Swiss-Prot record:
One of its GO terms (molecular function) is proton-transporting ATP synthase activity, rotational mechanism. It holds the Pfam family ATP-synt_C. Its main location: membrane. This is ATP synthase subunit c. InterPro entries: ATP_synth_F0_csu, ATP_synth_F0_csu_DDCD_BS, ATP_synth_F0_csu_sf, ATPase_proteolipid_c-like_dom, F/V-ATP_Csub_sf. Induction: Induced by a decrease in external pH from 7.5 to 5.7.
């Protein structure tokens, strides 16, 4: 197994952990301030977009290396 491929797998796991932490923060914030849901939702979509961008860059690198 190539160590580069292992590093890319670890990066993808980091993306999953990052999304989980983001959603955890969103749920806690909405539980405290339910009236701010629309503002939190827009910020959540922006955060998920950046996190998923990292995942897709990692996916492209894995295809290039393979």
């Amino acid at each position: 197994m190539n160590l580069t491929f292992l590093g890319l797998c670890i990066a993808c796991m980091g993306v999953s952990v990052g999304e989980g932490l983001l959603m955890n923060g969103l749920f806690k914030s909405v539980a405290r301030q339910p009236d701010m849901l629309s503002e939190f939702r827009s910020l959540m979509f922006l955060g998920v977009a950046f996190i998923e961008g990292t995942f897709f860059v990692t996916l492209v690198f894995s295809f290039i290396i393979k």
